[in-house]
Amino acid sequence: VAPAPDDAVLAFPAERIADWSTAVDLAKIVAGPGPAVTADDRAQLRADLTELTALAQDEVQGFTGLTAGGPGARAWVMGRGDWIRRNTVGLQRLMEPLAVRLLEAKPDRSAIARKALGAQVGSILGYVARRVLGQYDVFLPADDDGLIYYVGPNMIDFERRYGLEPRDFRLWVAIHEVTHRVQFGVAPWLRGYLGGLVDEYLGSISIEGGALTGQLRHAVDELQRDRSAWEGLGGVLLLLTPPQREIFARTQAMMSLLEGHASYVMNEVAARSVPDLARIQRALAERRSTRGVEQAFQRAIAFDQKVAQYAAGERFVREVVARGGQDALNQVWSSSSNLPTRDEVAEPARWVTRVGG
């Protein structure tokens, strides 16, 4: 698959609500180019990941008993700039329904407002682009299904920084991302379900001027009545309406499952095929314990909450497997009605009783 051209980010009408060129330019500045990598190192990384992605698919399918339809998983080793451009296009696709409503209400959106939103998007994308190792993009067009992104500079930087054996680390990353490919391959309805949640949430956002003020006033009143009800949930929930909180809960439960399952499979498969696994896990824990400005930014984007959410998902998967084996767990991919609720993620026995018993 050829890299997206630089002007691809301007191909969608959603460009009228944000300056996407500003987003891309700022993201590249924030991300930086990454470490210096020789042509030989780049070629070896591509060769390794092409081979290891195919190997990972065999390992994941053999371990889980799940067989993904469609094309096999394919590797695209890219730089930070390519990753930023691809994800900017994805964000535009997701924001299109909201963009239409905003432009209907206020077609003359100012250049300052567009640049401000572009700068916000760019700062977040740039930060993530410095850290992301691999990604299975669930919102790719159908003809790109199976494509897995690997951010080459980040992978090489991580290997060097922590003294890891390259092929072991590359296989470890591939196993995680290929697991996501298998999830969406064995359950084609997942892509539409996730997209539906995004559309449902964006459709619920009020574009009336006083709506946010009213929600904030209601949230403050609710917090004063019961402060403990919001502990650990994140301040963002204070500004959500009851229907939005329900959408948020379903999305959170689904992401807990997807990431928890990927972590479980990655760790179990890697335990028998990645000799350097213990050192990789220590390196990952060390990176997550970062301090200073980076930690403050992680808090601002609720990174710690996401890590805790995914850990809860892995606990859910492990308990279901312990109770009923892989066959019980694999029922979760049959239909959206079999997805765990947020409460069931916290108490897996409830899901087993409802679905997997």
Located regions from the model:
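N-terminal low-structure segments adjacent to metalloprotease catalytic domains
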Residues: 1-93, 311, 323-357
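Pan-zinc metallopeptidase signature
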Residues: 238-357
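Active-site recognition of the HExxH zinc-binding catalytic motif
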Residues: 169-185, 317
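Hydrophobic (often cysteine-bearing) scaffold residues that line and stabilize catalytic clefts
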Residues: 52, 121, 166, 171, ...
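Post-HExxH zinc-binding segment in Zn-dependent metallohydrolases
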Residues: 118, 125-133, 185-238, 242, ...
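Auxiliary, metal-adjacent structural segments of Zn-dependent hydrolase domains
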Residues: 52-153
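Acidic, low-complexity proline/glycine-rich segments
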Residues: 8-25, 136-150, 224-230
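Short pre-active-site segment immediately N-terminal to the catalytic Zn-binding motif
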Residues: 154-173
